[in-house]
């Protein structure tokens, strides 16, 4: 692995994108995203990146473009392909756009991403494509007690989120982890205390709630800055226990929403009992969500925040931090909640199920990926809902319809029979069936079956074996079912042409000759699967694992093993 070469690639791409000047932070983020193991050598790697960026920035823009075009043309094509992505033209314009936008996707790594959390990721990135600018990935992990980051032997949520975003085609320009920015938050807390815009509260929780509900100030609110700074130092030194001291932001004690009144910016968490997976017990004073977000949105230059309507109160709370510091608050747009019929999108409920997070019955992105949903289908679904403020409910069938659109052209057709019975009939001549792999792409070829003359045995579905019924064996002949005895149906040739079958209304059915046993896994709700064993063409053994297929009169599937397929949808 040549770190300098990878840095050179991303420095060129970043420079070309921004008029000839690459940004060290952006290049570092790209480098770390591609080679996560370099995080342990961040200081050493940054020295390399600094030198590479300086070299790239000294080149003329045309020289940068020429090298990028010759050596990594896909980086240019990726951006062009993104800009051509269907659905972007339907996005409403954002207010107050000055040049590009700086947006962020800020997941809490207490769980992996699911279909609902894909919405802010895709919408923010879509506007990054539309206007240009930056897309920031920020892990908001400052609650090691209640929402502890998920890092176990089985799953590392930080890395799983990165993997899910890459799969979605969402590429971030910068990455931050809030638990590694604690000193920054402490510095700004100290400034607020010095300004008299915050205070350390030693009230008992029940006493504070009473005063808040009565719209009264707590006795510590008017403490002079020097007293608050001394108490703050004691908090940092560990001289208070959990619940004994908090740092509050001064807001409006008469605000109609009690939760806005002097909200908590820092609290004590005993990390000797609940250590943080990244920082252990190094810190005991932790910023709340609203404080860390306010500081980061400003320092990272975020211009627009797109997030769920449930955060509307948080926007109000954060406004006080921006006002105290005299900062401009980002434009915030709230969209409604997305509900998926037939799918649980609650992180707490999904975690409580104790099912492996990438189980194909789950609506997690890893589960959907394992099932066979393509990322383009998720983009289509999210963009079709858009950023309207009202709640939206869509059926899983909508996602399946988008998925079908994308996999239909690449899914070759095969014959498979569930609940099979043997159909026996006599042929007075050789019967030939030419079955194309895809009716719309003749160039993919066909397979040819020759049966007869004489006794012919094929397998059909039991539901098609009805005495007195004429069926059209696909691409072969029209056969009348004479009688059915257990697992064997007996028939006779009725006619040969497709036109004759259409004339008499005979259904066209799939059939299998010289079959192989096929197992189909069918999701049947969260944590539940049905296993079906049927018979399929021998050609199915030649299909590569991971490929999509369509079984005639059955649906779309993805191959998972030598003779095992996962059912997606019809």
From Swiss-Prot:
GO biological process: glutamyl-tRNA aminoacylation
Record EC number: 6.1.1.17
Family (UniProt): Belongs to the class-I aminoacyl-tRNA synthetase family. Glutamate--tRNA ligase type 2 subfamily.
Coiled-coil parts of chain: none
Function noted in UniProt: Catalyzes the attachment of glutamate to tRNA(Glu) in a two-step reaction: glutamate is first activated by ATP to form Glu-AMP and then transferred to the acceptor end of tRNA(Glu).
Keywords for this protein: Aminoacyl-tRNA synthetase, ATP-binding, Cytoplasm, Ligase, Nucleotide-binding, Protein biosynthesis
A Pfam family recorded for this sequence: tRNA-synt_1c_C
Record GO cellular component, one term: cytosol
Motif ('HIGH' region): 107-117
Group of enzyme by EC: ligase
Catalytic activity: tRNA(Glu) + L-glutamate + ATP = L-glutamyl-tRNA(Glu) + AMP + diphosphate
Molecular function terms from GO: ATP binding; glutamate-tRNA ligase activity
Protein name as it appears in the record: Glutamate--tRNA ligase
Cellular compartment(s): Cytoplasm
Highest taxon of source: Archaea
